[in-house]
């Protein structure tokens, strides 16, 4: 059963609002994103939603079933974002960006670069060298993926966003080819010497995203 979504309102500058929630059911948030986007007007403020998900595999519109190698009893949801299969679970920051891309004069590639840049900026604060990849969207540290990206564009507006691994059980990634890449390693901030709590990193990521979107 899809549960109603409750997000704590935290105002942001320049028509951008940031909202926080705890650990949420994926289907509930997905339906809420679609409803928000469908009801937007040209004056609707853009929003960033920061939360975590209960364990779930999400399969993008281009997702191939063979990238799910086995199913350890975790739900699989075929969603409407771009990309292949990935895993979400507690201990991972989910940042959903609900933006009017026409109003921001942003193309998809530009937005992807800004999202990657925000994560790179955050990790740079902790002297962790990270980078994006032109051919495989996301953020990587030493060849291991630490953040996955996926978007849905509808009527010039976007939803979905990024997932940053912080301090989670990485074992479910072993049951998939993450983002469709065989043998792709994954990592997380807690394995890179970053000891700040998830809530601290959430706030910092929000600031990095807002800064990148203003550039």
Swiss-Prot record:
Name the chemical reaction catalysed here: octanoyl-[ACP] + L-lysyl-[protein] = N(6)-octanoyl-L-lysyl-[protein] + holo-[ACP] + H(+)
Gene Ontology CC annotation, any one: cytoplasm
Positions of the catalytic residues:
179
Q: Give residue ranges for domain BPL/LPL catalytic.
A: 42-215
Q: InterPro entries in the record, alphabetically?
A: aa-tRNA-synth_II/BPL/LPL, BPL_LPL_catalytic, Octanoyltransferase, Octanoyltransferase_CS
> One biological process GO term for this chain?
protein modification process
Binding of substrate occurs at: 81-88, 148-150, 161-163
Q: Which GO terms describe its molecular function?
A: lipoyl(octanoyl) transferase activity
Task: Give the chief site where it resides.
Answer: cytoplasm
Q: Which UniProt keywords apply?
A: Acyltransferase, Cytoplasm, Transferase
CDD domains found in the cross-reference section: LipB (cd16444)
The protein's role, per its UniProt record: Catalyzes the transfer of endogenously produced octanoic acid from octanoyl-acyl-carrier-protein onto the lipoyl domains of lipoate-dependent enzymes. Lipoyl-ACP can also act as a substrate although octanoyl-ACP is likely to be the physiological substrate.
List, alphabetically, the HAMAP family matched. LipB (MF_00013)
Q: Which family does it belong to?
A: Belongs to the LipB family.
Task: Quote the record's miscellaneous comment.
Answer: In the reaction, the free carboxyl group of octanoic acid is attached via an amide linkage to the epsilon-amino group of a specific lysine residue of lipoyl domains of lipoate-dependent enzymes.
Query: What is the protein named?
Result: Octanoyltransferase
Species of origin reads Nitrosospira multiformis (strain ATCC 25196 / NCIMB 11849 / C 71)
Q: What is the lineage of its organism?
A: Bacteria, Pseudomonadati, Pseudomonadota, Betaproteobacteria, Nitrosomonadales
């Amino acid at each position: 059963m899809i549960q109603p979504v409750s997000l704590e309102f935290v105002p942001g500058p320049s028509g951008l609002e940031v909202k926080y929630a705890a650990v949420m059911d994926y289907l509930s948030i997905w339906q809420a994103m679609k409803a928000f986007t469908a009801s937007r007007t040209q004056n609707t403020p853009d929003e960033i939603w920061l939360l975590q998900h209960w364990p779930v595999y999400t399969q993008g519109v281009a997702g191939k079933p063979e990238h799910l190698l086995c199913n350890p009893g975790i739900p699989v949801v075929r969603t409407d974002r771009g990309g292949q299969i990935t895993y979400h679970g507690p201990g991972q920051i989910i940042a959903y960006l609900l933006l009017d891309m026409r109003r921001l004069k942003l193309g998809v590639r530009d937005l992807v670069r800004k999202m990657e840049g925000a994560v790179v900026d955050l990790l740079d604060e902790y002297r962790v060298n990270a980078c994006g990849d032109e051919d495989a969207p996301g953020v990587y540290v030493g060849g291991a993926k630490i953040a996955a990206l996926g978007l849905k564009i509808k009527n010039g507006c976007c939803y979905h966003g990024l997932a940053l691994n912080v301090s989670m059980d990485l074992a479910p990634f072993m049951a998939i080819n993450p983002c469709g890449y065989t043998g792709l390693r994954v990592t997380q901030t807690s394995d890179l010497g970053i000891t700040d709590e998830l809530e601290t990193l959430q706030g910092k990521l929000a600031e990095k995203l807002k800064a990148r979107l203003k550039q």
